[in-house]
């Protein structure tokens, strides 16, 4: 049994994702595909445009055999934590032979070399990093310049400018850190950059697709997503279950901030950023403006989004300190082929497999992380136009194809 692991968000699944999946299967020659996928909230620090079950359905229709949820505490964290949680989860299945990820670089050796330095932190790198931080540079910029200095490779600066390269490096770092036997592969990304806002070419970015849906409606993206994605999105929107955006939670987040809800224990809050956020919350009535008022060279838009989302979802620093990766396997969906690999996982894994949510307390020794997932769904459904009920995790069926 040859099994390929992929780490995805499919927010939503578009032509570029389909290309990555098909090329990954060709390159690795694997029989089975297991996807670890973000749930209802994603790594950008935002809600997914439609819920995790609809996106799991997209994954299965694209050719994935088994979809497993990445816990929300990892799915909404930094690139490093996101990658570590996802890789640790794939490794814990005990059936994954390969992992394939997209990157703008397309050069596994170069990405691996960077990952080695970041993981091992040799003395010359640490000195350069400390020196750069002392100059008041952001951590990302200080790290970039330190890597250039110790390698003598100026092109590393360009490599670290794109999100898929950064995630790829973090995947490799995580594999090395846990001494995984999973073999990595990378597929060179085609089409628009992840952050591109323009709908153009055969492969538009997920960011531009979400923006087009928000501004022009679903029909505007029909050439950039597979037919099955379009149909799933149309069905969801017709039923009042999407599209969901961060601004849909503006009243709740602003209520928490204006009522003085403490921020100091929220992950990634430091250096007085909480005071800046409180001040901005008193000057606006929506999240978009709050982020504009708060962001700066030091406090990026991404960081502010993550802080606000963690406030909304009650994710604090303690969860990261007390857990070393996901401690359960939550199944969102599987195909006929997926049944076979799920049986194999059941034989080999040491983690509890959750297929019936009502049984989670008897299966998971420390259920705090899982309970964040349940709470995240309850919060997410507040943005629905219809059927905005709680406890959806308890009765929504697993997606089967």
Swiss-Prot record:
Its main location: cytoplasm. PANTHER family: TRNA(MET) CYTIDINE ACETATE LIGASE. ATP binds at residues 7-20, 102, 164, 189. It comes from Caldanaerobacter subterraneus subsp. tengcongensis (strain DSM 15242 / JCM 11007 / NBRC 100824 / MB4) (Thermoanaerobacter tengcongensis). It comes from the Bacteria. It is an enzyme of class 6 (ligase). GO terms for molecular function: ATP binding; ligase activity, forming carbon-nitrogen bonds; tRNA binding. InterPro entries: Rossmann-like_a/b/a_fold, tRNA(Met)_cyd_acetate_ligase. It holds the Pfam family HIGH_NTase1. It catalyses: cytidine(34) in elongator tRNA(Met) + acetate + ATP = N(4)-acetylcytidine(34) in elongator tRNA(Met) + AMP + diphosphate. The gene is tmcAL. One of its GO terms (cellular component) is cytoplasm. Belongs to the TmcAL family. Its EC number is 6.3.4.-. This is tRNA(Met) cytidine acetate ligase.
């Amino acid at each position: 049994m040859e099994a390929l692991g992929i780490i995805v968000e499919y927010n939503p699944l578009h032509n570029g994702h389909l290309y990555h999946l098909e090329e990954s299967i060709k390159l690795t020659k694997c029989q089975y595909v297991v996807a670890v996928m973000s749930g209802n909230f994603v790594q950008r620090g935002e809600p997914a445009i439609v819920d995790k079950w609809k996106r799991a359905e997209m994954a299965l229709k694209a050719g994935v055999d088994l979809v497993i949820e990445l816990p929300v505490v990892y799915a909404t964290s930094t690139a490093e934590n996101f990658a570590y949680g996802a890789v640790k989860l794939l490794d814990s299945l005990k059936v994954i032979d390969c992992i394939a990820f997209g990157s703008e670089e397309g050069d596994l050796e170069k990405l691996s070399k960077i990952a080695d330095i970041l993981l091992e932190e040799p003395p010359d790198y640490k000195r350069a990093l400390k020196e750069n931080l002392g100059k008041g540079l952001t951590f990302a910029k200080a790290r970039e310049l330190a890597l250039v200095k110790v390698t003598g490779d100026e092109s590393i600066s360009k490599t670290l400018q794109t999100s898929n390269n950064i995630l790829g490096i973090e995947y490799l770092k995580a594999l090395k850190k846990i001494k995984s036997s999973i073999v990595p592969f990378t597929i060179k990304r085609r089409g628009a950059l992840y952050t591109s806002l323009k709908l153009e070419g055969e492969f538009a970015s997920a960011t531009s697709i979400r923006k087009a849906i928000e501004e022009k409606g679903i029909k505007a993206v029909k050439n950039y997503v597979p037919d099955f994605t379009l149909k799933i999105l149309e069905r969801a929107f017709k039923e009042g279950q999407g599209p969901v955006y961060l601004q849909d939670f503006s009243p709740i987040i602003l209520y928490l901030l204006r009522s003085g809800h403490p921020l100091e224990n929220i992950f990634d809050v430091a250096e007085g950023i909480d005071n800046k956020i409180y001040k901005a919350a008193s000057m606006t009535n929506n999240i978009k403006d709050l982020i504009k008022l708060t962001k700066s060279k030091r406090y990026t838009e991404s960081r502010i989004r993550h802080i606000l989302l963690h406030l909304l979802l009650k994710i604090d620093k303690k969860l990261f300190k007390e857990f070393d990766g996901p401690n359960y396997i939550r199944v969102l969906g599987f195909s006929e082929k997926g049944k076979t690999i799920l049986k194999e996982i059941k034989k080999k894994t040491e983690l509890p497999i959750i297929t019936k949510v009502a049984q989670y307390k008897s299966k998971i020794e420390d259920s705090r992380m899982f309970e964040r997932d349940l709470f995240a769904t309850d919060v997410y459904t507040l943005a629905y136009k219809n059927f905005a009920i709680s406890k959806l995790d308890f009765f929504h069926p697993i997606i089967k194809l």
